[in-house]
């Protein structure tokens, strides 16, 4: 059994991946204005890309990140342009269609790689501090998550982020001033899909890789976005980190089977106490 300090460090790294997932989902909800239930499938896609690279002797997390992001972006743009944009005014159709895509992906993954969980070698430690092992994938995951959160926060507070903010607030005005709203929507969908795949590729060495592995991260990212709000990106980041820590510590102290139940209980309690989410409680921040 690993020491508690190791569990806490791994929880931070897990939370960083959850933060990436939640950031991508927040982009889709804010700009495209749909609930994308296929978001978890892109997370799974990233994990399988990392697995395929590892089985071919490429053990670089950076290579996995770039390849997973590129493939997921292409699929995301295709899905956003060919399906999401045409039916986005019908939320039920979007939900059913995106869920159908996720199920289709799970079935294809099962045909290609089987239903049994796969694993990736954790590799040599990046560093060891007082017996606590720091893995490359975890460090990169944390750095990427911090960089993306910082970039998104900066973008939304600068003129360069005006198109996204304007589309999120009023699409008619955005179209009236000459913005290609439809193009921005499907490119945003592609970018968010790429972020989800990066999260999956970075977390792949620490989890069992299976066709349905994206379901729990999808649920947790939805919870994070609902609780934190779509515009409070740093609130979103820290809440995701907290969920990662809570997940790992509860699995360590209790049992893995209780971990996600405890997470759902805590967040449901949070939403009961603050129905409008954490963002409404901190109007002056980020």
Spell out what each predicted region is:
Residues 82, 86-157, 184-187, 282-286:
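Transmembrane helix-bundle core of multi-pass membrane transporters
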Residues 9, 31-78:
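Membrane-embedded helix boundary and interhelical linker motif in transport proteins
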């Amino acid at each position: 059994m690993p020491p508690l300090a190791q569990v806490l460090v791994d929880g931070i790294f897990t939370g960083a991946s959850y933060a990436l997932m939640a950031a991508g989902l927040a982009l889709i909800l804010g700009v495209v204005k749909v609930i994308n239930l296929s978001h978890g499938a892109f997370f799974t896609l990233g994990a399988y890309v990392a697995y395929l690279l590892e089985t071919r002797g490429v053990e670089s997390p950076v290579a996995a990140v770039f390849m997973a992001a590129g493939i997921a972006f292409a699929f995301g743009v295709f899905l956003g342009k060919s399906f999401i944009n045409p039916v986005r005014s019908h939320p039920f159709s979007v939900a059913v269609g995106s869920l159908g895509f996720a199920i289709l992906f799970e079935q294809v993954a099962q045909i290609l790689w089987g239903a049994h969980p796969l694993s990736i070698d954790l590799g040599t430690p990046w560093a060891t501090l007082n017996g606590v092992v720091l893995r490359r994938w975890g460090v990169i995951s944390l750095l990427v998550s911090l960089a993306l959160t910082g970039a998104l926060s900066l973008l939304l507070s600068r003129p360069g982020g005006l198109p996204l903010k304007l589309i999120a607030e009023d699409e008619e005005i955005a179209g009236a001033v000459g913005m290609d709203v439809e193009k921005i929507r499907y490119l945003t969908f592609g970018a968010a899909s790429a972020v989800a795949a990066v999260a999956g590729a970075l977390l792949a060495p620490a989890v069992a890789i299976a066709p349905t592995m994206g379901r729990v991260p999808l649920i947790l990212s939805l919870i994070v976005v609902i609780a934190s709000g779509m515009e409070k990106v740093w609130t979103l980041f820290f809440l995701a980190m907290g969920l990662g820590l809570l997940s790992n510590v509860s699995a360590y102290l209790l049992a893995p089977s209780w971990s996600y139940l405890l997470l759902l209980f805590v967040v449901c309690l949070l939403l009961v106490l603050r129905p409008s989410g954490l963002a409404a409680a901190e109007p002056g921040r980020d």
